Amino acid sequence: MFEQTFKNIDDILHKDAGCGSELDYVEQTSWVLFLKYLDDLENDKQTAAELTGKTYTNIIAPEYQWAVWAAPKLNNGKIDHNAFTGDDLLDFVNQKLFPYLKKFKTSAESANTIEYKVGEIFSELKNRIQSGYNLREVVNLID
């Protein structure tokens, strides 16, 4: 299952003008996977806090959370087909999401925080996927 998904992602990235090698495929797949993992982690922490009567504050602002920009769902749980795609998705990722995540490095309380680590990761990354339609396909496969 996972092997076929990664092969499908590689096939999509192979078609993209911004990804010229297997190293690009790995790097681009990694940042998308990381954001999905981070969203799942925050959801788990939120659930655990609710079960113990505590509150949890997400480190990612609502408008930058996976469920908002990457995989918005309708009330019935199905994918919202009005989600960002094409140039809208690329503009959001390149001009809003990445700059937002890079700022975590300077705004974190210390280097030992997850915020700092997120900022460090995204200060070294660049979205190389040039087609917002290819990026949408990759995001959908990872979701």
Describe each model-derived feature in a short phrase.
Residues 1-143:
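Non-catalytic, mostly N-terminal accessory regions of nucleic-acid modification and defense proteins
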